[in-house]
Amino acid sequence: MKTSRSTTTDQVCCPWPTPVQTPTVLNSSSPPFHAHGWTVSMLSLVKLLTVTTSLRRLSPWVLLPVPPRLELLLPSPVNYNRSAWNNTAKIETNYSLLNYMYMYKVCVCMTINSYN
């Protein structure tokens, strides 16, 4: 019997054939689908940054003083009563909106700080 002096080559691997996988319908036990490369926290951060950016765009407009309406400058009591009622409702609406935006901005800032 002859012996070879050459080194033994890597073994050839021949796995058993497997059946082709058929796609299945997603059900409640299936893992949730996420876009590749994005995690849930990254997606929520993108939404959060979009909201804060739009709030920053709004903030200079919120701080501008509102010019007085012409009806307030007129001495007629009819115009005064009507305009006073309209302006009171507008002031309350604007105050509520500003209060809501301020509270939302505080919540957004607290959320951003919690990520850091």
Curated annotation (Swiss-Prot):
Phenotype caused by lack of the gene: Enhances the toxicity of heterologously expressed alpha-synuclein.
Anything else known: Partially overlaps CPR1. Disruption phenotypes caused by deletion of this gene may also be a result of a defect in its overlapping gene.
Identification of the protein by name: Putative uncharacterized protein YDR154C
Organism: Saccharomyces cerevisiae (strain ATCC 204508 / S288c) (Baker's yeast)
